Structures are given as C-alpha cells and as structure tokens.
C-alpha cells in the first residue's frame, strides 16, 4: 500500500473516530460524515486512475451526488432540529423521550 492510500485511509479512520467520539452535536456529526465521504471519493478516484478502469469512471461522480444529497438532508434536519428545540444536540432526536 502506498503512502497516498495510507494517508487517505487514515483520514477515513480519523473521520470515523470523530463521528464515534464527538456525537453530542449534530453539526459535528455531519462534518465527520462529510470527511468520510471526501476520503472515500479521493480513494475511489485514485484507485480508478491508477488502475485505468475506464468503465468505472462515473463511480466517483455518483458518490459525489449521493454525498450532496446526504449533506442537503443533514442540513435540513439540522435546521429543523435547531428551530424546534433551540439546540443541535443529537439526544434531541430520540423519539422515545417525552
């Protein structure tokens, strides 16, 4: 494994650890998810370019489309939660609480 792939994999792991550790606020969780999607995009693009997969050249674009949809839904959820509860705590999303 080259150093480029190791650094990209390390960025993915750091974003995953940030998502697992700092999950009190919704904004920090969304930021960690975006970091994970960015590292997946770079890893997929580098793999396709290095291995000359011409048929799979649309896969990073499709991943970016899904990342944009995920970001839009996450931000709309953030606005809804912050308007309803006044904060962006993730514990406000628990539907079982009274």
Curated annotation (Swiss-Prot):
Molecular function in Gene Ontology: NADH dehydrogenase (ubiquinone) activity
Signal peptide stretch? none
InterPro entries hit by this protein: NADH_UbQ_OxRdtase_chain4L/K (IPR001133), NUOK/Mnh_C1-like (IPR039428)
Q: Which residues cross the membrane?
A: 1-21, 29-49, 61-81
Enzyme Commission number(s) from the entry: 7.1.1.2
User: GO cellular-component terms in the record?
Assistant: mitochondrial inner membrane; respiratory chain complex I
As for membrane topology, the entry says: Multi-pass membrane protein
Name any Gene Ontology BP term: ATP synthesis coupled electron transport
Catalytic activity annotated for this protein?
Answer: a ubiquinone + NADH + 5 H(+)(in) = a ubiquinol + NAD(+) + 4 H(+)(out)
Location in or out of the cell: Mitochondrion inner membrane
Ordered alphabetically, the record's keywords are: Electron transport, Membrane, Mitochondrion, Mitochondrion inner membrane, NAD, Respiratory chain, Translocase, Transmembrane, Transmembrane helix, Transport, Ubiquinone
Give the main EC class.
Answer: translocase
In terms of domain of life, where is this protein from?
Eukaryota
Family named by the database record: Belongs to the complex I subunit 4L family.
Q: Partners and quaternary state?
A: Core subunit of respiratory chain NADH dehydrogenase (Complex I) which is composed of 45 different subunits.
Query: What PANTHER family does its record include?
Result: NADH-UBIQUINONE OXIDOREDUCTASE CHAIN 4L, NADH-UBIQUINONE OXIDOREDUCTASE SUBUNIT ND4L
According to its UniProt entry, what is the function of this protein?
Answer: Core subunit of the mitochondrial membrane respiratory chain NADH dehydrogenase (Complex I) which catalyzes electron transfer from NADH through the respiratory chain, using ubiquinone as an electron acceptor. Part of the enzyme membrane arm which is embedded in the lipid bilayer and involved in proton translocation.
* Protein's name according to its UniProt entry: NADH-ubiquinone oxidoreductase chain 4L
Highest classification ranks of the organism: Eukaryota, Metazoa, Chordata, Craniata, Vertebrata
Encoding gene per record: MT-ND4L
């Amino acid at each position: 494994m080259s150093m480029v792939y190791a650094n990209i994999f390390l960025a993915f792991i750091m974003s995953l650890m940030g998502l697992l550790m700092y999950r009190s606020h919704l904004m920090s969780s969304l930021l960690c998810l975006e970091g994970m999607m960015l590292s997946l995009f770079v890893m997929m693009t580098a793999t396709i370019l290095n291995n000359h997969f011409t048929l799979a050249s649309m896969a990073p674009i499709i991943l970016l489309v899904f990342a944009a949809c995920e970001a839009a839904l996450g931000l709309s959820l953030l606005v809804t939660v912050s308007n309803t509860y006044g904060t962006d705590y993730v514990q406000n999303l628990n539907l079982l609480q009274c």
